[in-house]
Amino acid sequence: MRHHNANRKFGRSKNQRHALLKGLAASLIQHGRILTTEAKAKELRPNVEKMVTRAKNPTLASRRLLLSGFYNNESVVTKLISDIAPRYAERAGGYTRIIKLAARKGDASPMAVIEFVQ
């Protein structure tokens, strides 16, 4: 039975899932919006929301924690702390939106765009 199993597994191991979500989060922060499957967007959203909330208080500890979540990619963390987090200083959450799109042609997978709210 699947009771109390909240997260999607995407047919991948734990390490592969974490790598996928780290990569998607870094792409979203770099580009502002990404096209992905609906399930991946829904799984990515809470992770990114927590990262933005963490970046709103830019201490050394929070910077290091964010760096560990992005493969030590300094440019992504700098953009998150200096560009994205100040936009949402007055907002208490809900930094992203998911827009559902038509199914992908090859395998009919439901697609979605996840982007930062302006």
Model-derived segments and spans:
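Structured, basic alpha/beta domains of bacterial-type, RNA-associated proteins
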Residues: 1-12, 16-19, 23-118
